[in-house]
Each structure stands twice: as C-alpha cells, then as structure tokens.
C-alpha cells in the first residue's frame, strides 16, 4: 500500500515522503495513529495544501525535544528497591519506574521515551539509560539503583 507520511517515522521516511508499506502496517498502525494517509490523488492535494503547516509543527516538536534533551542530558536519578544480600533486586526496575522517577524530579518524560535495550534492571548499581525524546533527539542519563533498608 502506498502512503504519505504525515510525520517522520523511524526506519521508514520523513514528512511528505510517499512510501510503500505492507497493508497491515498501514491499516493497523500508521493510519490510525495519524502518522500516514493513503496516497490517493485527493490526499496528495490536501497534503500539498497543508505541507507548510505540518513542517512548522514538526519543527516545533523537534525544538521542544532538543530543549528537553538539554535539560536531561547527564542527569542522574536514584531509585530504591528492596534487594537481597547478593545485590539482586526483588522485582525489577522498568522503563515506567524510571519515567515516574524523572517526572517526580520535574522532567516531562513518558515511559515510551525510556529505552532499556537489555530489559529491566535487576541488580543494584549504576546504569546508563538512553531517552529517545524524538526520532532525531536522544538524551543520556544515569540511573542509580540502591537497596532499601
């Protein structure tokens, strides 16, 4: 299926690109989330009329993500969790826990922004974590997991 991208989509294309994707990906994800429209003649003309506005919105989103990245870069967040004698946690620290701790510090971070490539944190220590704030902007923070008494 041919679609017009209404936003930058990672590993697919930029705003305004006409790309061919599988029908299910378009029908079940791209179109319902507003990231794409079918590439019909009417939609192509409507997109051409809206292109300047959509580019301005995309630039605003990018500027906001860069501003948030500057505030978050190098930040450290401490999370306490019950742990055993060997340093392994009873439970784990997930991306939702990290996002919640950052929100408590006053940062605007959603749990989908937190990237844990090795899965949840399951031991005490310091961990580097990447926050993907935009498809072009990321911030590196440090998560310190300490044991509760």
From Swiss-Prot:
<comment type="similarity">
    <text>Belongs to the bacterial ribosomal protein bL9 family.</text>
</comment>
<keyword id="KW-0689">Ribosomal protein</keyword>
<keyword id="KW-0687">Ribonucleoprotein</keyword>
<dbReference type="Pfam" id="PF01281">
    <property type="entry name" value="Ribosomal_L9_N"/>
</dbReference>
<dbReference type="InterPro" id="IPR036791">
    <property type="entry name" value="Ribosomal_bL9_C_sf"/>
</dbReference>
<keyword id="KW-0694">RNA-binding</keyword>
<dbReference type="InterPro" id="IPR020069">
    <property type="entry name" value="Ribosomal_bL9_C"/>
</dbReference>
<dbReference type="GO" id="GO:0003735">
    <property type="term" value="F:structural constituent of ribosome"/>
</dbReference>
<dbReference type="InterPro" id="IPR009027">
    <property type="entry name" value="Ribosomal_bL9/RNase_H1_N"/>
</dbReference>
<dbReference type="GO" id="GO:1990904">
    <property type="term" value="C:ribonucleoprotein complex"/>
</dbReference>
<dbReference type="GO" id="GO:0006412">
    <property type="term" value="P:translation"/>
</dbReference>
<keyword id="KW-0699">rRNA-binding</keyword>
<dbReference type="InterPro" id="IPR000244">
    <property type="entry name" value="Ribosomal_bL9"/>
</dbReference>
<dbReference type="InterPro" id="IPR036935">
    <property type="entry name" value="Ribosomal_bL9_N_sf"/>
</dbReference>
<comment type="function">
    <text>Binds to the 23S rRNA.</text>
</comment>
<dbReference type="Pfam" id="PF03948">
    <property type="entry name" value="Ribosomal_L9_C"/>
</dbReference>
<dbReference type="GO" id="GO:0019843">
    <property type="term" value="F:rRNA binding"/>
</dbReference>
<dbReference type="InterPro" id="IPR020594">
    <property type="entry name" value="Ribosomal_bL9_bac/chp"/>
</dbReference>
<protein>
    <recommendedName>
        <fullName>Large ribosomal subunit protein bL9</fullName>
    </recommendedName>
</protein>
<dbReference type="InterPro" id="IPR020070">
    <property type="entry name" value="Ribosomal_bL9_N"/>
</dbReference>
<dbReference type="GO" id="GO:0005840">
    <property type="term" value="C:ribosome"/>
</dbReference>
């Amino acid at each position: 299926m041919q679609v017009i991208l209404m936003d930058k989509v990672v590993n697919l294309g930029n705003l305004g690109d006409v790309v061919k994707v599988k029908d299910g990906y378009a029908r079940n994800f791209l179109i319902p989330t507003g990231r794409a429209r079918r590439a019909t003649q009417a939609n192509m003309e409507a997109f051409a009329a809206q292109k300047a506005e959509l580019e301005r919105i995309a630039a605003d989103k990018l500027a906001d993500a860069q501003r948030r990245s500057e505030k978050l870069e190098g930040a450290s967040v401490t999370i306490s969790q019950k742990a055993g004698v060997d340093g392994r946690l009873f439970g784990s620290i997930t991306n939702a826990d990290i996002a919640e701790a950052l929100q408590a510090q006053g940062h605007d971070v959603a749990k989908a922004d937190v990237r844990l490539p090795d899965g949840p944190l399951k031991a005490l220590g310091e961990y580097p974590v990447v926050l993907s704030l935009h498809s072009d902007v990321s911030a590196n923070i440090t998560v310190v997991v300490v044991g509760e008494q």
